[in-house]
């Protein structure tokens, strides 16, 4: 399967509610994230992320959505190496403690729900929204933008949930470990570079 076919497979998997793995560039973080569409989140999938991903679960959203929910940047002066745009953390108002997989799934789903309002979220909380650049991976080659781009390509609400993948010893999982994990978990593995090429080809066809 070539790289562009892998993107098509990833989109199909996401539409069917599956998780996928997205790896970024080797000269960037060189990390892999589990990615799912917020529309199809379940407590079981969140539990899979916490058990096997082991990283921080975040919720990529659009800048427009962040404004709608009054989600301001966590830091006014962002000094993160790669400019990851965290907002203040939140919990959905129906949550108990906010940390159970059911509570976190509810918050992820609510962040994507068009009818949700800013007042529906308690701040701070246990979920971390991330604001994606408007042009997606063509503007910033991060997992945040890749996740939102994939949601759009899947004709879903432009919101996803992601989690970095760590090895058993707590170090970051990189190639070839990511390939092994994708095979073990029966998940499609793509790269941000694959997605950039897919989007560039899509734009070229449109023009």
UniProtKB/Swiss-Prot annotation:
The keyword Metal-binding applies. Keywords: Lyase, Magnesium, Manganese, Metal-binding, Riboflavin biosynthesis. Homodimer. Its cofactor is Mg(2+); Mn(2+). Its EC number is 4.1.99.12. NCBIfam families: ribB (TIGR00506). This is 3,4-dihydroxy-2-butanone 4-phosphate synthase. GO terms for molecular function: 3,4-dihydroxy-2-butanone-4-phosphate synthase activity; GTP cyclohydrolase II activity; magnesium ion binding; manganese ion binding. It catalyses: D-ribulose 5-phosphate = (2S)-2-hydroxy-3-oxobutyl phosphate + formate + H(+). Binds 2 divalent metal cations per subunit. Magnesium or manganese. The record marks 126, 164 as: Essential for catalytic activity. Mg(2+) 2 binds at residues 29, 143. Belongs to the DHBP synthase family. InterPro entries: DHBP_synth_RibB-like_a/b_dom, DHBP_synthase_RibB. It comes from Oceanobacillus iheyensis (strain DSM 14371 / CIP 107618 / JCM 11309 / KCTC 3954 / HTE831). The lineage of its organism: Bacteria, Bacillati, Bacillota, Bacilli, Bacillales.
């Amino acid at each position: 399967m070539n790289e562009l076919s892998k993107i098509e497979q990833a989109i199909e998997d996401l539409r069917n509610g599956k998780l996928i793995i997205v790896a970024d560039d080797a000269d960037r973080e060189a990390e892999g994230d589990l990615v799912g569409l917020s529309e199809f989140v379940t407590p079981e999938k969140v539990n899979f992320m916490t058990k096997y991903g082991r990283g921080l679960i975040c919720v990529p959203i659009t800048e427009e959505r962040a404004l709608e929910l009054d989600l301001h940047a966590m830091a006014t002066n962002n000094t993160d190496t790669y400019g990851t745009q965290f907002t203040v953390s939140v919990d959905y108002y129906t949550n108990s403690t906010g940390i159970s997989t059911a509570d976190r799934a509810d918050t992820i789903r609510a962040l994507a729900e068009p009818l949700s309002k800013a007042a529906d979220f308690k701040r701070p909380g246990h979920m971390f929204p991330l604001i994606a650049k408007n042009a997606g991976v063509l503007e910033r080659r991060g997992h945040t933008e890749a996740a939102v781009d994939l949601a759009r390509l899947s004709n879903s609400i432009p919101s996803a949930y992601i989690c970095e993948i760590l090895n058993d010893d707590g170090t970051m999982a990189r190639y070839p470990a990511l390939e092994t994990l994708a095979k073990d978990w029966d998940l499609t593995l793509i790269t941000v570079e694959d997605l950039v090429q897919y989007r560039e080809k899509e734009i070229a066809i449109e023009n």
